[in-house]
């Protein structure tokens, strides 16, 4: 049928060609309903698979057949309505199948210019509410709004189950000439898989995953799955009311480093039971991320997982890796044909020895992505803190690279200035959102000021995991007891820098550590008991992966009992945790007995009489009547010994209180004489009493 002259004159053939070639980034200028002169409205649609299309205006008796303006499937018709009206498209495909749809190009843009300005400035911290797929109603019609950042794309389309993965059908609208593309699709719904088809200026078409998808397939394809975030419940107010106290610097912090989880209810129950049984205050978990949103797990299930642990009064921390992403072709790499998530400088982009790329932290759209993901984990999924991995890789441009394999910063140095700014913005943003969220740095560098405040030119983390402590102490413990004298400085060294940062001390996989300990089976257990006990008594918050050595003997049960008891001892004694981040909470008494391999120090709490004296014997030699200096005159009662018989020790303990003598030792006026078990840690609680002469 020949097109009417009036309709023909309304056709913008250049724009129509852009639509039919799938190269249009402003399809709403061409498609949908547009008022024209004469009190009429031009309705157009692009349906390349259709043989016939009609417009059914709401309230009218009959549908109006559209004319085929372009043989590639561009249909148009003039409707005698001037005011905006509701309509549907009745489509008959070339096989005779019929369907009726709402026109996606009949709906207004819902992302505002203000939203985009905040994104372009790197301060849209809930960017996950803007980008990605969102189940919503538009003008009373249910559907899904899709939005993606692809600033250098020629055209972006949503493809998925709802359109047969045909990129011609749902070409997205570029908003305000920005890099954000949006489209509301009425026939899309929750549970449908989707991706973005991106056409490059070279003419090449690529398929990309949605970086902001709340749910993804748990397979290699990792297609996004439309998910209604309203199904995720809010945080438990009763938990939030007490979280500030639980996460205080003056509260005990005993982290169970659990590792990967499937976030199931069963896993939550098992972790909560284990953590409660052993006395852990926090649990650290990790998931499968792509690259930052957890793949294959329902967000409602993840929030349920965290809430289940909260009901057991256990805080949940998640390991978060904002340093890099996979270089696979369907992910963030060269997302719109250009380097928008990575640096265009290959020396800065590539992670040495891996198929990964570093995020370009100098770009606001990237910072928004990372900061938004952090807020999503904390606000939507109810995590209580982030353990940030690979901080060192982010802070240093030359990390793991050859001398010629990196590009210096603008001042010629190796510090990543963008990473420093990013971490400061991250810590400021998170702590402004909630002051009781924990931000923990997992890095092994001497970069200064990790836990210093941003106002003091620090990065603003709450804690830093002290891998140096783990390395030095385990290096010492791996030596034969008789040979430890030559390595005595290694066990003392961590206290030199203990208060440079707010440290968390890690002990990973006690089963592996047991295998590394010297000596026969009994000595291995003695060393392990000593290590765990020293770890708890040493200043610094704690992180433990408590996996007992293999077997079911009494030694295994004894180690498990020791771990439970020593954690309980830590949790109930403010002397050990209230001032463990302050120099005033610790004092060396004897750190010069290399020949005996003995250390003696005091731990102090907030009250004057909150004093413990800790004696650690790293040799397999016992001592009777061993003289040690004490902080003040009084009574000293042994309240813990790793050599107790219930821990499969020798029971070489001090059962009765010991009164100090006015006899100089270790540079102090008062002293006590004690029994010191081999390979042991013992703790003496001070109470006021007159010293004996």
Place the predicted regions along the sequence by residue:
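An acidic- and aromatic-residue-enriched active-site/binding cleft used to recognize and process polar
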Residues: 151-153, 161-163, 199-201, 288-290, ...
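Hydrophobic residues within beta-strands of alpha/beta enzymes
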Residues: 53, 156, 283, 384-386, ...
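Short glycine-biased active-site loop of nucleotidyltransferases that positions the nucleotide triphosphate
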Residues: 67, 173, 327-334, 339-341, ...
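Substrate-binding/active-site clefts of carbohydrate-active enzymes
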Residues: 213-225, 229-232, 236-415
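Conserved alpha/beta catalytic core and glycan-binding cleft of carbohydrate-active enzymes
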Residues: 382-384, 402-548, 571-628, 632-643, ...
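Carbohydrate-interacting/catalytic domains
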Residues: 1-256, 261-264, 269-279, 525, ...
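Alpha-helical packing segments of well-folded alpha/beta enzyme cores
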Residues: 271, 301, 305, 366-377, ...
């Amino acid at each position: 049928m020949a097109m009417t002259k009036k309709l023909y004159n309304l056709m913008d053939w250049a724009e129509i060609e852009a639509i039919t070639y799938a190269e249009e980034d402003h399809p709403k200028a061409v498609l949908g309903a547009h008022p024209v002169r004469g009190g009429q409205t031009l309705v157009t649609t692009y349906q390349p698979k259709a043989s016939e299309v009609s417009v059914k205006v709401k309230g009218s008796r009959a549908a109006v057949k559209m004319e085929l303006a372009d043989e590639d499937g561009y249909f148009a018709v003039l409707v005698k309505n001037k005011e905006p009206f509701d309509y549907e498209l009745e489509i008959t495909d070339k096989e005779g199948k019929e369907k009726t749809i709402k026109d996606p190009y009949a709906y207004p843009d819902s992302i505002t210019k203000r939203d985009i300005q905040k994104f372009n400035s790197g301060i849209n911290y809930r960017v996950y509410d803007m980008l990605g797929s969102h189940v919503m109603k538009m003008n009373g019609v249910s559907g899904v709004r899709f939005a993606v950042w692809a600033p250098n794309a020629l055209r972006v389309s949503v493809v998925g189950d709802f359109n047969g993965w045909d990129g011609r059908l749902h070409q997205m609208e570029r908003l305000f000439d920005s890099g954000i593309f949006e489209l509301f699709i009425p026939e899309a719904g929750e549970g449908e898989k989707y991706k973005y088809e991106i056409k490059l200026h070279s003419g090449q078409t690529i398929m990309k995953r949605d970086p902001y998808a709340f749910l993804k397939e748990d397979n290699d394809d990792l297609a996004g799955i439309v998910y209604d975030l309203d199904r995720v419940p809010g945080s438990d107010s009763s938990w939030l009311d007490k979280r500030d106290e639980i996460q205080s610097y003056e509260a005990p912090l005993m982290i169970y480093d659990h590792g990967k989880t499937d976030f199931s209810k069963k896993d939550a129950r098992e972790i909560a039971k284990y953590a409660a049984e052993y006395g852990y205050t926090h649990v650290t978990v990790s998931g499968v991320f792509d690259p930052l949103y957890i793949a294959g797990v329902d967000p409602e299930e993840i929030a349920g997982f965290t809430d289940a642990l909260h009901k057991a009064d256990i805080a949940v921390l998640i390991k978060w890796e904002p340093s890099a992403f996979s270089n696979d072709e369907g992910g963030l790499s060269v997302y719109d044909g250009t380097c928008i998530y990575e640096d265009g400088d290959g020396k800065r982009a590539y992670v040495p020895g891996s198929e990964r790329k570093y995020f370009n932290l100098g770009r606001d759209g990237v910072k928004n992505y990372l900061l938004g993901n952090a807020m999503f984990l904390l606000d939507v999924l109810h995590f209580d803190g982030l353990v940030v991995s690979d901080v060192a890789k982010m802070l240093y441009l030359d990390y793991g690279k050859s001398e010629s394999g990196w590009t210096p910063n603008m001042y010629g140095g190796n510090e990543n200035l963008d990473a420093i700014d990013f971490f400061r913005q991250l810590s400021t943003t998170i702590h402004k959102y909630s002051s009781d969220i924990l931000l923990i740095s997992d890095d092994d560098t001497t970069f200064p000021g990790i836990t210093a405040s941003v106002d003091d030119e620090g990065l603003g983390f709450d804690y830093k995991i002290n891998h140096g402590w783990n390395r030095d102490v385990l290096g010492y413990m791996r030596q034969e007891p008789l040979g430890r004298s030559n390595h005595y400085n290694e066990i003392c060294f961590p206290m030199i820098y203990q208060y440079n940062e707010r440290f968390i001390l890690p002990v990973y996989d006690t089963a592996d550590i047991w295998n590394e300990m010297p000596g026969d089976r009994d000595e291995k257990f003695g060393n392990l008991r000593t290590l765990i006990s020293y770890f708890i008594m040493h200043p610094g918050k704690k992180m433990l992966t408590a996996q007992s050595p293999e077997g079911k003997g009494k030694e295994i049960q004894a180690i498990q009992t020791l771990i439970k008891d020593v954690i309980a001892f830590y949790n109930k004694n403010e002397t050990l945790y209230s001032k463990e981040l302050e120099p005033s909470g610790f004092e060396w008494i004897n750190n010069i007995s290399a020949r005996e391999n003995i250390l003696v120090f005091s731990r102090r709490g907030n009250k004057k009489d909150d004093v413990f004296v800790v004696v650690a014997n790293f040799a397999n030699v016992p001592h009777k009547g061993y003289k040690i200096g004490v902080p003040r005159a009084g009574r000293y009662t042994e309240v813990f010994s790793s050599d107790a018989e219930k821990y499969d020790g020798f029971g070489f303990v001090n059962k009765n209180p010991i009164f100090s003598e006015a006899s100089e030792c270790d540079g102090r006026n008062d002293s006590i004489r004690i029994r010191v078990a081999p390979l042991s840690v013992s703790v003496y609680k001070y109470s006021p009493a007159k010293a004996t002469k």
